[in-house]
From Swiss-Prot:
GO terms for cellular component: ribonucleoprotein complex; ribosome. Disulfide bonds: none annotated. Part of the 50S ribosomal subunit. Contacts protein L29. This is Large ribosomal subunit protein uL23. NCBIfam families: PRK14548.1, uL23_arch. Keywords: Ribonucleoprotein, Ribosomal protein, RNA-binding, rRNA-binding. InterPro entries: Nucleotide-bd_a/b_plait_sf, Ribosomal_uL23, Ribosomal_uL23-like, Ribosomal_uL23/eL15/eS24_sf, Ribosomal_uL23_CS. Belongs to the universal ribosomal protein uL23 family.
Length: 86
């Protein structure tokens, strides 16, 4: 699966901004069929960042969210800034 097909869009809200600042986490809507391995590879390819942990959930509307924790040597704020959301 192509990295641009896996990662759909970042989620920007007060909660996600707090996660970026305090927990070094990013939140994206992802392709519903994407596995955690697909998401990990897409983050590595698109942002050159190593992933420490991924949690996923499917919303009642059927969209899949990925909560991505980056390793401590990478800054989620810098990745968010490169996306123009921070």
């Amino acid at each position: 699966m192509d990295a641009f097909d896996v990662i759909k869009t970042p989620i920007v809200s007060e909660k996600t901004m707090k996660l970026i600042e305090e927990e070094n986490r990013l939140v994206f809507y992802v392709e519903r069929k994407a596995t955690k391995a697909d998401i990990r590879a897409a983050i590595k390819e698109l942002f050159d960042a190593e992933v420490a942990d991924i949690n996923t959930s499917i919303t009642p509307k059927g969209k899949k969210k990925a909560y991505i924790t980056l390793k401590s040597e990478y800054n989620a704020g810098e990745v968010a800034a490169s996306l123009g959301i921070y």
